[in-house]
Amino acid sequence: MSAIPAEESDQLLIRPLGAGQEVGRSCIILEFKGRKIMLDCGIHPGLEGMDALPYIDLIDPAEIDLLLISHFHLDHCGALPWFLQKTSFKGRTFMTHATKAIYRWLLSDYVKVSNISADDMLYTETDLEESMDKIETINFHEVKEVAGIKFWCYHAGHVLGAAMFMIEIAGVKLLYTGDFSRQEDRHLMAAEIPNIKPDILIIESTYGTHIHEKREEREARFCNTVHDIVNRGGRGLIPVFALGRAQELLLILDEYWQNHPELHDIPIYYASSLAKKCMAVYQTYVNAMNDKIRKQININNPFVFKHISNLKSMDHFDDIGPSVVMASPGMMQSGLSRELFESWCTDKRNGVIIAGYCVEGTLAKHIMSEPEEITTMSGQKLPLKMSVDYISFSAHTDYQQTSEFIRALKPPHVILVHGEQNEMARLKAALIREYEDNDEVHIEVHNPRNTEAVTLNFRGEKLAKVMGFLADKKPEQGQRVSGILVKRNFNYHILSPCDLSNYTDLAMSTVKQTQAIPYTGPFNLLCYQLQKLTGDVEELEIQEKPALKVFKNITVIQEPGMVVLEWLANPSNDMYADTVTTVILEVQSNPKIRKGAVQKVSKKLEMHVYSKRLEIMLQDIFGEDCVSVKDDSILSVTVDGKTANLNLETRTVECEEGSEDDESLREMVELAAQRLYEALTPVH
């Protein structure tokens, strides 16, 4: 049995190449109806070089039609320059405007601070620059279509420009949340709840079943911890990524310093080589933020800070006395945050505040277990004496937000991604418990590992829409509509041939068929035989040659020693032409047909000639006063008060009321009419 073509298959396949029971290198492959989509293309922050990539070797990049990037974090877009520049991928790539603006600078910083050799680097600054030309942008709620795949995006919260993508293929809808947050903060709106319910929801599970502390309590704890560190004469290190949570923390610290004059002499530094560029982007895209920021921008730009200075590198830093430094990267694998941590970790007055989610295998995750010593990038062992606090400002949903989001959408299938194995398992169990006794809502929860496929079946109805000329009149019950079925991507239309050029790129062409058939018999005999078959033969002259129109579409022209058939090719006309050809060949090859022709099929009898001569003939038989003409097609004969009416076209006789029993009158009139007809149309 042959395999079903991918385009006709009802199987939908979802396979994580990254972020399957892990956090990092998000990359989800979606396959349905012969279309392939990649959702995000990130790197693993705890790994280096090729090891940090998703399992791209399991796919053929040339087969991917569409690549959608949810936001600018490295674990969601860090492998994109490599994928666009170093593979056979030829599809189209989309992200929001803000994501594209920040992607450029964030990955530039990643290239510069990566602590690996040039040979192990996945891509260069040049690759990154060239990848920009291959990335297209999409506005929130703007519907686009690529290769029959419709998609649009919603605000996801999380970071500036973060998007959730709704994808529709052949009527099946899938929502990919990426990283999202349902809690509005100081500058970002909460993630939207789409008004369209998806069939499949691919959702992050970073925090599993944890419940976040309230925003006000978290901010107060953060500010108090920073205050305590500088009060004891220490230096506060807050490792963050250059963009994202950093801007939220800067807004909090700037406001806190403003309200505490005693802190005005203690500097706050935003230490990133991208500091100025990043802030310029944030100052540009305020319209993508929440209402509070949009209103405030009319008075002053909240991202122009009063108490925070930019620090490009350690060369510009006077490390004297207490200070607060926000430095990238967030997990301290390399860069400024790692340098400062190694410099300050041996002094118990100093403190580090981990303010975001930390991936396994990173220094930030390691120090949260409070080890007695750490290993520097040069391999030296140092005692860890500085205080370590974890206050999560990570803008991911907690269990309450996740479960409410699922409850609002009620998708039949939920696919969990972007979560550590145990957290994901706990979330899956909690969601199953929530819906196991609910008879109205049935939700299947899946948590695939990396490279493990989830296969779902969706049997969509095929509906064809009648358009154009065929749709001008409302059809009646039982009416047959005939047209051309046009399939474009996953839409079917029935069109009249004359509408093809209006609704498609197809050109309308006609093929005129001509066929010559040997024929030496009488042409009027052929006319007679075709008339017996069809009941409707029109006699014509074409270029002074006798011709017939049969079935209204087949023309038969007499030529010396043959007849020529002409018709416009289509399935019905071709069938009619085959029938006419069969009749011609039968008449030509069978002499009995000519001998057995009882009907005299000469030239077509002129009706008015026949009528006049029959009238004279009947007057000779019955008397001049007994015969009269009615309506040009009826001859009436009255004898001894009995009347017989002769139909000139059919040569049949009907007797009027009271004359039915006079069979002799009817027979005499009918016989006279038939004899005259045969005399006027002799057999050749």
UniProtKB/Swiss-Prot annotation:
GO terms for biological process: co-transcriptional mRNA 3'-end processing, cleavage and polyadenylation pathway; mRNA 3'-end processing; mRNA 3'-end processing by stem-loop binding and cleavage; positive regulation of G1/S transition of mitotic cell cycle. It is found in: Nucleus. It holds the Pfam family Beta-Casp. There is a cross-link at residues 462, 465, 545 (Glycyl lysine isopeptide (Lys-Gly) (interchain with G-Cter in SUMO)). Its cofactor is Zn(2+). It comes from the Eukaryota. The keyword Zinc applies. InterPro entries: Beta_Casp, CPSF73-100_C, MBL, Metallo-B-lactamas, RibonucZ/Hydroxyglut_hydro, RMMBL. The modification Phosphothreonine is found at residue 681. Sumoylated on Lys-462, Lys-465 and Lys-545, preferentially by SUMO3. The modification N-acetylserine is found at residue 2. GO terms for cellular component: mRNA cleavage and polyadenylation specificity factor complex; nucleoplasm; ribonucleoprotein complex. Coiled coil: none annotated. Zn(2+) 1 binds at residues 71, 73, 158, 179. Binds 2 Zn(2+) ions per subunit. Changing residue 73 to A: Inhibits histone 3'-end processing. The modification Phosphoserine is found at residue 659. Zn(2+) 2 binds at residues 75-76, 179, 418. GO terms for molecular function: 5'-3' RNA exonuclease activity; metal ion binding; RNA binding; RNA endonuclease activity. It is an enzyme of class 3 (hydrolase). Keywords: Acetylation, Disease variant, Endonuclease, Epilepsy, Hydrolase, Intellectual disability, Isopeptide bond, Metal-binding, mRNA processing, Nuclease, Nucleus, Phosphoprotein, Ribonucleoprotein, RNA-binding, Ubl conjugation, Zinc. It is linked to Neurodevelopmental disorder with microcephaly, hypotonia, nystagmus, and seizures: An autosomal recessive disorder characterized by global developmental delay and impaired intellectual development apparent from infancy. Affected individuals have hypotonia, poor or absent motor skills, feeding difficulties with poor overall growth, microcephaly, mild dysmorphic features, and early-onset seizures. Additional variable features include nystagmus, cortical blindness, and spasticity. Component of the cleavage and polyadenylation specificity factor (CPSF) complex that plays a key role in pre-mRNA 3'-end formation, recognizing the AAUAAA signal sequence and interacting with poly(A) polymerase and other factors to bring about cleavage and poly(A) addition. Has endonuclease activity, and functions as an mRNA 3'-end-processing endonuclease. Also involved in the histone 3'-end pre-mRNA processing. Component of the cleavage and polyadenylation specificity factor (CPSF) complex, composed of CPSF1, CPSF2, CPSF3, CPSF4 and FIP1L1. Interacts with CPSF2, CSTF2 and SYMPK. Interacts with TUT1; the interaction is direct and mediates the recruitment of the CPSF complex on the 3'UTR of pre-mRNAs. Interacts with WDR33. Interacts with ZC3H3. Belongs to the metallo-beta-lactamase superfamily. RNA-metabolizing metallo-beta-lactamase-like family. CPSF3 subfamily. This is Cleavage and polyadenylation specificity factor subunit 3. The lineage of its organism: Eukaryota, Metazoa, Chordata, Craniata, Vertebrata.
